[in-house]
Swiss-Prot record:
General function of this protein: Activates KDO (a required 8-carbon sugar) for incorporation into bacterial lipopolysaccharide in Gram-negative bacteria.
Reactions this protein catalyses: 3-deoxy-alpha-D-manno-oct-2-ulosonate + CTP = CMP-3-deoxy-beta-D-manno-octulosonate + diphosphate
TM helices/strands, residue ranges: none
Any one GO cellular component localisation term in the record: cytosol
UniProt gene name: kdsB
Keyword annotations from UniProtKB, A to Z: Cytoplasm, Lipopolysaccharide biosynthesis, Nucleotidyltransferase, Transferase
Organism of this sequence: Xylella fastidiosa (strain M12)
Cellular location(s): Cytoplasm
Family per record: Belongs to the KdsB family.
Pathway(s) per entry: Nucleotide-sugar biosynthesis; CMP-3-deoxy-D-manno-octulosonate biosynthesis; CMP-3-deoxy-D-manno-octulosonate from 3-deoxy-D-manno-octulosonate and CTP: step 1/1; Bacterial outer membrane biogenesis; lipopolysaccharide biosynthesis
Top-tier EC class: transferase
MF terms (GO), sorted A to Z: 3-deoxy-manno-octulosonate cytidylyltransferase activity
Known EC number: 2.7.7.38
Protein name per the record: 3-deoxy-manno-octulosonate cytidylyltransferase
Length: 257
């Protein structure tokens, strides 16, 4: 499906105290802070504005050297990246209808076409939020809890997100752990689009049981009865960086380019 380019802004939530990889935004990838590489992906996509939302002065100072990137100093009490971006939207003064792309701060290889596509998907759907997914064909990815899986309905909207391998193939997985063509299994890509007004509504939703169990903020949207449009993207999205092992793989990928 080809989607036209629509105007959008990008906001990148970044916190220093990531439990699995402390100081993640400032970790070096190819000799440069990770947050620099993520922000530059947003700029390359043609965003009207690019903001980094952080509660840490070290991250703010690192971003200050980037041309065309703004910084929002936010509270340190936010429960999720989307809560942080809602404050960023208020600081930036965006109108409620502005399309905001939430680009996770651990996605240094996000293709520009994918960033534009999620904004276009929101524009062309009736959903409150839009996101992307790609197919899974490796067992190690399907059973990796750091790689989020999702299932959709017949209208291309998310039914559920999980760290567990969903859907569970009862018969096949009784004897093997290899994905089969009966899926397809989908990997969620940490990229969302919604309008600035919906970000403010998000902050009024209470985190539900599912969000707290899975530690996945997008489940708050589903639990509250809202819809998330999903596009299975043809663009190659390397997994995000959550652990020291992920960072080492990303470093090697850069060296191999």
């Amino acid at each position: 499906m080809s989607l036209e380019i629509v105007p959008f802004v990008v906001a990148i939530p970044a916190r220093f105290s990531a439990s699995r990889l402390p100081g993640k935004p400032l970790r070096l990838l190819g000799g440069r802070p990770l947050i620099h590489r993520v922000a530059e992906r947003a700029l390359s996509a043609g965003a009207r504005e690019v903001w980094v939302a952080t509660d840490d002065v070290r991250i703010a100072e690192a971003v200050a050297s980037l041309d065309g990137v703004h910084v929002a100093i936010t509270a340190n009490t936010h429960l999720s990246g989307s809560d942080r971006l809602a404050e960023c939207a208020r600081i930036a003064g965006w109108d409620p209808e502005v399309c905001v792309v939430n680009l996770q701060g651990d996605e240094p290889f996000a293709p520009a076409a994918g960033i534009r596509a999620v904004a276009a998907l929101l524009h062309h759907s009736n959903a409150d939020m839009a996101t992307l997914a790609t197919t899974i064909d490796k067992s190690e990815d399907l059973f990796n809890p750091n790689i989020v899986k999702l299932v959709c309905n017949a209208h291309g909207e998310a039914l559920y997100f999980s760290r567990a391998p969903i859907p569970w193939n009862r018969d096949t997985f009784a004897t093997t752990r290899e994905p089969t063509p009966l899926g397809p299994w989908l990997r969620h890509i940490g990229l969302y689009a919604c309008n600035a007004g919906f970000l403010q509504r998000f902050t009024t939703m209470q985190p539900g049981t599912l969000e707290q169990i899975e530690s996945l903020e997008q489940l708050r949207v589903l639990e509250a009865g809202h819809r998330i449009a999903v596009r299975i993207t043809p663009e190659h999205f390397p997994p995000g960086i959550d652990t020291p092992e992920d960072l080492a793989k990303a470093e090697k990928a850069l060296e191999d380019v």
